[in-house]
Amino acid sequence: MSALRDPRNADILNYVGYSYRRLRELVPAFAHFRQALTLNPRHRAAHQHMGEAYLTIGNLAAAEEHLAALERICLIPCDEYDDLQRVIAKYKSSAMH
């Protein structure tokens, strides 16, 4: 249980941020994603989840920045890139209707 209280664990910070995002508590979600990315700028899941959070508030440009970061990080295809790319495409498609 001590891992849950470790502010230096990027995985835990990402999971907490993800949980806040699912609860639509975006201020603490963004704070946790930022902390995770400060500790590990190459944290793929944090980039994916932060990109999805940006779409929740309608910030497509910021979401695409995280997609670009994933493209640089993932030397071979990775699920996080594919998932965020899919969510962005769906967002763009729904915005056109």
Positions of PLM-derived features:
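Structural marker of alpha-solenoid helical repeat scaffolds
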Residues: 5, 39, 72-76
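Canonical tetratricopeptide repeat
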Residues: 15, 49, 83-87
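Register position in tetratricopeptide repeats
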Residues: 22, 56, 73, 87-94
